């Protein structure tokens, strides 16, 4: 893609309304634009990142055996009355009526809808377990939306829901998602620490938040530093191995980890002083086991092995891709701009032509772009008639993993320059060696 033809509305000045790093950088890098309080348009660069985050989330959900569906955003109020949550949810829920005066709502979550889908189509324990998930837009009318997409009113959410015959089977479904989330965050270049959490309005008696450490985090967290080096299960992890998966979850919950809401200073004091870590953190995922909280009032039942009907045991599991984009920036940036992990970078390579109009530079850039794209790498080619300094600033701001710098002086010696955005390391090399070099690194 040529930058001269791309839509990248970069801002030179830092917007006054942006309070945290990710909000400032997403606005400045032309990733998003605010349309109303807590509501954002995702522009081309931001959408590429958002789609890549969703691809990783989707791949790990599928690997764990979850099945993707898509449920309506506008939901019937009567379903929420069945579960008892319609009045309890509060003003965060946007309520509306259609032309026939039927009460509807803009779904902040989907436990009721997915339970209705399940009860209408599943009758026997032989059809279990099931884990259904979607990636869709949600709306919560926050009193004070802030921090850009970190705490917006409209947001993209992966919400999943499991259905099992009993508590033991439901716990295994919970563990599957627990492990799949560990893998998801690792693939996104994040170290997420699971912490026991309050179940809040969703309910239930078992819940974990997944927290990444960041200086601008909204919560204070306390944990054992052992979590920073714990190995994440590999792609070959067997999600059907009940004991093996329980062992992974036990290992990842054996050390102290708590947000300020659940923190117990006396228990934390038992952690060796050298291993205690107090920091700021950002919630990037939340999982719940809530038993029959929804299935009992909504009569989501199956026939068990003994022929009697019983309510299914349920769990719900959330990751916010739009929030994850901001969280990744909070965890990975410097004074010059964003530093994208390879897995979710909008493009792999920023190709910088230092002298547009120079025949040798133009030809070399065209050949390099073709070679990189043939090798499976995505390229954003800065072919604008701008000063080199402006091009370098743009490349650093948008944070693509690699910068390939092509200028007349280097080409005279048959060389180009390669820069790694994360480390700042530079090297000169022959253009023909470039694709293999990037692939190897």
UniProtKB/Swiss-Prot annotation:
One of the record's GO molecular function terms: proline-tRNA ligase activity
InterPro entries: aa-tRNA-synt_IIb, aa-tRNA-synth_II, aa-tRNA-synth_II/BPL/LPL, Anticodon-bd, Anticodon-bd_dom_sf, Pro-tRNA-ligase_IIa, Pro-tRNA-synth_IIa_bac-type, Pro-tRNA_synthetase
Localization terms from the record: Cytoplasm
Pfam families from the UniProt entry: HGTP_anticodon, tRNA-synt_2b
Keyword Transferase: no
Primary residence: cytoplasm
UniProt subunit comment: Homodimer.
Protein name (Swiss-Prot/TrEMBL): Proline--tRNA ligase
Species for this entry: Methylorubrum extorquens (strain PA1)
Lineage of producing organism: Bacteria, Pseudomonadati, Pseudomonadota, Alphaproteobacteria, Hyphomicrobiales
